[in-house]
Swiss-Prot record:
Gene3D superfamilies in the cross-refs: 3.40.1380.10, ATP synthase, gamma subunit, helix hairpin domain
GO molecular function, one term: ATP binding
Single GO BP term: proton motive force-driven plasma membrane ATP synthesis
Protein purpose: Produces ATP from ADP in the presence of a proton gradient across the membrane. The gamma chain is believed to be important in regulating ATPase activity and the flow of protons through the CF(0) complex.
Entry protein name: ATP synthase gamma chain
Keyword line: ATP synthesis, Cell inner membrane, Cell membrane, CF(1), Hydrogen ion transport, Ion transport, Membrane, Transport
Species this protein is from: Shewanella sp. (strain ANA-3)
Chief place of localization: membrane
InterPro entries membership: ATP_synth_F1_ATPase_gsu, ATP_synth_F1_gsu, ATP_synth_F1_gsu_CS
Membrane topology: Peripheral membrane protein
Length: 286
């Protein structure tokens, strides 16, 4: 059994760690609330944009935009949104597993693939995973701006426009609630048709003055908005996962302190008993 002094030092060390994890939990909780507010503010726009584009994809257009045409998938692109920092449980690992599984299914169909990782952890993973990394972004912070993403997204859009990509997906952790964050893969291009009940009441839009000029701008803006929403959702998921992970670490530290305190008490009691035995033995000898 370790000495009482050694155990006491270990208890002090665990207590210091507990203070750090507790502080990180509170910081993550505060950041999560702000991230949720940003996510809630941008979600209606992203969902409305998705709905409008879904109807556009269903409509009978005189001008057929390349983003509406479905072609054979020979090369697939992924914009993968992960975190810049760790200490957020299995958030990134679960996301990467989902991407790897999807890549495997496309690989079996003979398709090639390339990646656009967003977030330092995503960049690190896909540079070692294999496959072409066409563009990447990291260090976006807790309050990213669309302008920070446009350059990276445009690289993938240009590849699609040039026929180097036949499918484009965005992958991120969708924020469900504080305890649940789900990795999702959403198709960006070709534009997915709306699965809404409103499709039953189908209509066409009238484009003024020119459908080509409008759609060229609108569809690019749609892709950018969906990627931005994915980044915002992922930040909220990151802070929620970190808060839960740090709470678990704080609780585990408390349990470990209790266990060490018990061991310390036993060691101290054994030392006192030993001293008493020696005193009694010495007195008997006299």
């Amino acid at each position: 059994m370790a000495g009482a002094k050694e155990i006491k030092t270990k208890i002090a060390s665990v207590k210091n760690t507990q203070k750090i994890t507790s502080a990180m939990e509170m910081v993550a909780a505060s950041k999560m609330r702000r991230a949720q507010e940003r996510m809630a503010a941008s979600r209606p726009y992203a969902e409305s944009m998705r709905k409008v584009i879904g109807h556009v994809a269903q409509g009978s257009l005189e001008y057929k935009h390349p983003y509406l045409e479905v072609r054979e998938a020979k090369r697939v692109g992924y914009i993968v949104v992960a975190t810049d920092r760790g200490l957020c449980g299995g958030l990134n690992v679960n996301l990467f597993k989902k991407v790897v599984s999807d890549v495997k299914s496309w690989k079996e169909q003979g398709a090639e693939f390339e990646f656009c990782p967003i977030g330092a952890r995503s960049v690190q993973f896909f540079k070692s995973f294999g496959g072409q990394v066409s563009a990447h972004a990291s260090g976006l912070g807790d309050a990213p701006k669309l302008a920070d993403l446009i350059g990276t997204v445009r690289v993938m859009l240009d590849a699609y426009n040039e026929g180097k990509l036949d499918r484009l997906y965005v992958v991120f952790n969708k924020f469900v609630n504080t305890m649940t964050q789900t990795p999702v893969i959403e198709q960006l291009l070709p534009l997915p048709k709306s699965e809404d009940d409103e499709v039953a009441h189908r209509w066409d839009y009238i484009y003024e003055p020119d459908p080509k000029a409008l759609l060229d701008t609108l569809l690019v803006r749609y892709v950018e908005s969906q990627v931005y929403q994915g980044v915002v959702e992922n930040i909220a998921s990151e802070q929620a996962a970190r808060m839960v992970a740090m709470k678990a670490a704080t609780d585990n530290a408390g349990t470990l302190i209790d266990d060490l305190q018990l061991v310390y008490n036993k060691a101290r009691q054994a030392a006192i008993t030993q001293e008493l035995s020696e005193i009694v033995s010495g007195a008997s000898a006299v």
